[in-house]
Amino acid sequence: MAAFALLFVAPSCESDDTDFSQIIADHDTVSIRNIQFNDAEVEDSAEQIPTDIADEYFDDYIENQDLNRVVNIAFNGEDATVSGDLTRCRILRNGAHLTVYITGKKVYLKVSGSTRNGSIKVYGENKFGIELCNASIHNPHGAAINSQNKKRMYVVLAEGSRNVISDGADYIDTEGEAQKATIFSEGKIIVSGKGMLQVDAQARAGIASDDYVRLRPGVHTQIISHGTHCIRANDGVMIDGGVHNLETFGNAARGIRCEAFVKMKSGRTTVITHGASVIEDIDTTGAAAVKADSIVVVSGGELRLKSTGEGGKGINAADYVQTGGTVMVVTLGENGLSSPKGVKSDSRITIEGGSFYSYSVNSYAIEGTLVLKPGAKKHLTAKRYHIVEY
């Protein structure tokens, strides 16, 4: 087993029992990196689609499904037309607000057209697909796409399409039902395809799942949230590739918020937060680009994070592990109710490969027990920055 060097960094103390000959503590040698949205294409790493039905994630891949019962939904202003195979679903219409009752397997909704007062709500007990083909759906009073189905929802972005999904500031809730985001599902959300998904969230999160969210290679997303988080999930967020630009303006809001883990394999994800800290009950909570209750793992790709608000953090997790890829974190906020940090871990910040950069203008770049695999080509550290390159 390879030896690792440990360095504990916290606001109250610093101790280093290892000879880091490469450490340079000169602020003038390090500049604040510019982090902004980048829509350019990225070369994703090769995707390994499971072929063994016993694989834990076999069903996450639409290629392993046979969703051949195609239902066409075309929005047209205050109305919508429905055609195709309706043998395994029933659709009720109220203007451009559609309620889909899935009664059998293999249902695949193909959605096109535009509405400023419409939505799709899905009930059922079977996984289903929803392909967005240059669709524009705005629901002024709730989620634009709302799956009350606890099975997987495969969101497919048609190749070359640009899809705009948005909510309004005034939600009307149904008793006993959740609608936590502009795109919400009680089950897993798997996003794939070679198109663009733009989500404009006014009141609640952009995309939310009561299970987990997976973003597959080739997907382009832009999620702007004015109220709360951009992506929210209970059981995991997996970024397998693609280009993702997330920005949130809400106080104590997070770009990516997960009650379990966040894992990034490939692609480029940029997250910018602007919100300040708030007091909830007796606890103080602040904004963060990425917040995970368990672990954040980066094995590849490019993760670019910036928090500008008071007390905002780049990464806030119980544990952080990086084995590859490029991570850049900048926090610009002032100290206030909460203290800004580049990367904050309740346990360890383990870096075994790739490139790591964290800069905090007004506080510590990292907080936690730093564990470095030997062999780094560069290691620069001071209170406000920390850089490691392999």
Language model: regions and residue ranges:
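C-terminal motif of bacterial Sec signal peptides marking the signal peptidase cleavage site
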Residues: 9-12
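A composition-driven surface/loop motif
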Residues: 14-390
